């Protein structure tokens, strides 16, 4: 059997590795490097990939593509700002997708990434002496479904059979924990070239269980580079009244110089930036030069807000895992940007311990991917290793009043299964529409709809009598199945929703952030909806009493009917004062009416305690809307 490889398809650099003698090993490329720049250049019919492409970038900026991972699987309206910073032309493609124009040809990001993968696999095949066809490819933990699918398609375009797409922090944890025997709680801090993930895992007895994950999808080493680029350009503009960012060749040279300075500042207190002949004076055509010295202190000042953004995902991951910093046994640094001294200081400050640097931050992810490939191929040297991941956002259904009823909460381990009982909102309601939602906000409209389906053929019965059993089932592949069954009739309907993490990363972060920022407003809205729902339920109960006690005194029926009508109008008005007034009046009239019927022996109180009796303890008091 041909060996399967593990590939870290990075924003800045990529790495390929394979299992050798029970251990993962990095495969060097044709140039002898352990990492390959994720850079592709087009020169006529020739395609250059890796270091050779990077070397000629300044002379060929419009056709040298880098950081393409930031565009893969994303919509145009998500990447406009990043596109504007690129020396090459990024534009809107079919259906709001992203395309890169090179020499009059429109390329999808997947095509460009496939060139990097093809280079990695070709070099590795030559080193191993066998053709490689199977691979595990890693992605950031917060990559959405379209980004994961696009990454997989890039592998397929490169001629690979993609065995699995796994999360980068989980892969890094595999590499770290492969030979460790004890039980540990590990925080993986992954700051790469374009993305930032924090994942907390529990390791022990061959089990790698993800407890929580958080991240910032617009934070990576490239953002630190761009701050240096902007500083250099603004300094030059102040001195010469010329913006270098408008000159593609000059911009490419600035980007390269910024990255080099950032790397220098990881080991030195200052870096000299010298770019002779950076451009020409537009009037005199005399050459212009850029000479600057960037200190580490100035670099940290330029990136202060980026460094602050590093803190929040760490704090969120700890909170979601219900852990304190003292519960973390080890901190693993992944990604080249973790070499920035200020980043290391922040991590140590947040967790209270020195990060474990036994794992190479550039290679750990690829090594872990090779371990996963070995597991899939049944490598006996690995023994029994189990990975347990989580769902990143809450899953639920929309109920009466436009609210979400949570079914499976954020950071629940998968596979997972949950069943709840719901009921109908109206008398003789023939069907219900199930709106499956994902998100952290209490109102359905503020969350992502994953799909809708209808359960029809419910037998005629009073509101609240139907018992609709809704089951959410997420399998190990992340595929969500939702089933709804009316227990009286046995009528059943279902929907399968593939890849439930279909939100783009910015949507995930926005939902969590807005949930925190709008907690007070959400609470008020939720309380308002609950008051309206309570009054409407009481109105339905009053109507049922009138139907079941037709022989009651006319004045008593008229009084209750008037109170019920007022309640209906108050619910429609959504006016808090009217709702409270109508609630008090209807409660009083209903109590008087039912007491009179009991005394007269003309009827039993039907459902007077419907919302608190033991019989209804398993029924959630949040009714569905009627299906259209």
Swiss-Prot record:
InterPro entries: ATPase_NBD (IPR043129), Chaperone_DnaK (IPR012725), Heat_shock_70_CS (IPR018181), HSP70_peptide-bd_sf (IPR029047), Hsp_70_fam (IPR013126). Residues 596-612 have a biased composition (Low complexity). Induction: By stress conditions e.g. heat shock. Residues 555-591, 614-628 have a biased composition (Basic and acidic residues). GO terms for molecular function: ATP binding; ATP-dependent protein folding chaperone; unfolded protein binding. Gene3D superfamilies: 3.30.420.40, Actin, Chain A, domain 4, Substrate Binding Domain Of DNAk, Chain A, domain 1. Residues 545-628 are annotated as: Disordered. It comes from the Bacteria. It holds the Pfam family HSP70. The modification Phosphothreonine is found at residue 195. Keywords: ATP-binding, Chaperone, Nucleotide-binding, Phosphoprotein, Stress response. SUPFAM superfamilies: Actin-like ATPase domain, Heat shock protein 70kD (HSP70), peptide-binding domain. Belongs to the heat shock protein 70 family. Acts as a chaperone. This is Chaperone protein DnaK.
């Amino acid at each position: 059997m041909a060996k399967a490889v593990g590939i870290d398809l990075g924003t800045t650099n990529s790495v390929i590795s394979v299992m050798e003698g029970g251990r993962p090993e990095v495969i060097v490329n044709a140039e002898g490097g352990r990492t390959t720049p994720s850079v592709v250049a087009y020169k006529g019919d020739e395609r250059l990939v890796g270091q050779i492409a990077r070397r000629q970038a300044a002379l060929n900026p419009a056709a040298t593509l880098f950081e393409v991972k930031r565009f893969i699987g994303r919509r145009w309206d998500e990447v406009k700002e990043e596109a504007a910073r690129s020396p090459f032309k990024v534009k809107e493609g079919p259906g709001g997708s992203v395309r890169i124009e090179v020499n009059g040809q429109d390329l999808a990001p997947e095509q460009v990434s496939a060139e990097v993968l093809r280079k990695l696999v070709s070099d590795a095949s030559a080193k191993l002496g066998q053709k490689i066809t199977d691979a595990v490819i890693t992605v950031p933990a917060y990559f959405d479904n379209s980004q994961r699918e696009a990454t997989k398609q890039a592998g397929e375009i490169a001629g690979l059979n993609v065995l699995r797409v796994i999360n980068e922090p989980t892969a890094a944890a595999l590499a770290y924990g492969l030979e460790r025997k004890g039980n540990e709680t590990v925080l993986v801090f992954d700051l790469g070239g374009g993305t930032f993930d924090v994942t907390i895992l529990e390791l022990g007895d061959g089990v790698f269980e993800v407890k929580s994950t958080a991240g910032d999808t617009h934070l990576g080493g490239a953002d630190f580079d761009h701050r240096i680029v902007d500083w250099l350009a603004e300094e030059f503009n102040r001195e010469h009244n010329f913006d270098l960012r408008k000159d593609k060749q000059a911009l490419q040279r600035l980007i390269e110089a910024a990255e080099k300075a950032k790397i220098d500042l990881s080991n030195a207190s200052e870096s000299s930036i010298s770019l002779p002949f950076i451009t020409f004076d537009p009037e005199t055509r005399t050459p212009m030069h850029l000479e600057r010295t960037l200190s580490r202190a100035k670099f940290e000042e330029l990136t202060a807000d980026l460094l602050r953004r590093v803190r929040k995902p760490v704090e969120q991951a700890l909170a979601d895992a219900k852990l304190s910093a003292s519960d973390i046994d080890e901190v693993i640094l992944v990604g080249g940007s973790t070499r920035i001294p200020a980043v290391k200081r922040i991590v140590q400050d947040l967790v209270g311990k020195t990060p474990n640097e036994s794992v190479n931050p550039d290679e750990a992810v690829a090594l872990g991917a090779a371990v996963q490939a070995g597991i899939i191929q049944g490598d006996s040297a690995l023994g029994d290793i189990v990975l347990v991941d989580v769902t990143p956002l809450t899953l639920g259904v929309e109920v009466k009043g436009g609210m979400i009823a949570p079914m499976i909460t954020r950071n629940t381990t998968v596979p997972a299964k949950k069943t709840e009982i719901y009921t109908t909102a109206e008398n003789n309601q023939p069907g219900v529409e199930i709106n499956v939602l994902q998100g952290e906000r209490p109102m359905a409209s503020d969350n992502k709809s994953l799909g809708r389906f209808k359960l029809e053929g419910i037998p005629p019965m009073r509101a609240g009598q139907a018992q609709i059993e809704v089951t959410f089932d997420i399998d190990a592949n992340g595929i969500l199945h939702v089933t709804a069954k009316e227990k009286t009739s046995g009528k059943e309907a279902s929907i399968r929703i593939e890849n439930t993490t279909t939100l783009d990363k910015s949507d995930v972060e926005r939902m969590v952030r807005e949930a925190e920022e709008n907690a007070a407003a959400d609470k008020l809205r939720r309380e308002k909806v609950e008051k309206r729902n309570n009054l409407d339920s009481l109105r339905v109960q009053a109507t049922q009493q009138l139907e079941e006690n037709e022989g009651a005194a006319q004045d008593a029926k008229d009084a209750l009917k008037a109170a019920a009508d007022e309640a209906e109008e108050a619910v429609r008005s959504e006016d808090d004062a009217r709702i409270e007034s109508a609630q008090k009046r209807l409660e009083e009239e209903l109590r008087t009416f039912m007491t009179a019927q009991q005394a007269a022996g003309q009827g039993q109180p039907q459902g007077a305690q419907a919302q608190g009796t033991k019989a209804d303890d398993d029924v959630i008091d949040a009714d569905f809307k009627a299906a259209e």
